[in-house]
């Protein structure tokens, strides 16, 4: 997937723009 501009180690991903956590990095679905 396309990496989002954030990590999901300490904060959750921006699911409102379709990002989900994979391997400690937020990816767009």
From Swiss-Prot:
<protein>
    <recommendedName>
        <fullName>Cyclotide mra1</fullName>
    </recommendedName>
</protein>
<dbReference type="InterPro" id="IPR036146">
    <property type="entry name" value="Cyclotide_sf"/>
</dbReference>
<feature type="disulfide bond">
    <location>
        <begin position="4"/>
        <end position="19"/>
    </location>
</feature>
<keyword id="KW-0611">Plant defense</keyword>
<dbReference type="GO" id="GO:0006952">
    <property type="term" value="P:defense response"/>
</dbReference>
<comment type="similarity">
    <text>Belongs to the cyclotide family. Bracelet subfamily.</text>
</comment>
<comment type="function">
    <text>Probably participates in a plant defense mechanism.</text>
</comment>
<keyword id="KW-0960">Knottin</keyword>
<dbReference type="InterPro" id="IPR005535">
    <property type="entry name" value="Cyclotide"/>
</dbReference>
<dbReference type="Pfam" id="PF03784">
    <property type="entry name" value="Cyclotide"/>
</dbReference>
<dbReference type="InterPro" id="IPR012323">
    <property type="entry name" value="Cyclotide_bracelet_CS"/>
</dbReference>
<feature type="disulfide bond">
    <location>
        <begin position="13"/>
        <end position="26"/>
    </location>
</feature>
<keyword id="KW-1015">Disulfide bond</keyword>
<feature type="disulfide bond">
    <location>
        <begin position="8"/>
        <end position="21"/>
    </location>
</feature>
């Amino acid at each position: 997937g396309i990496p989002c501009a954030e990590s999901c180690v300490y904060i959750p991903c921006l699911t409102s723009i379709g990002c989900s956590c994979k391997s400690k990095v937020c990816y767009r679905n």
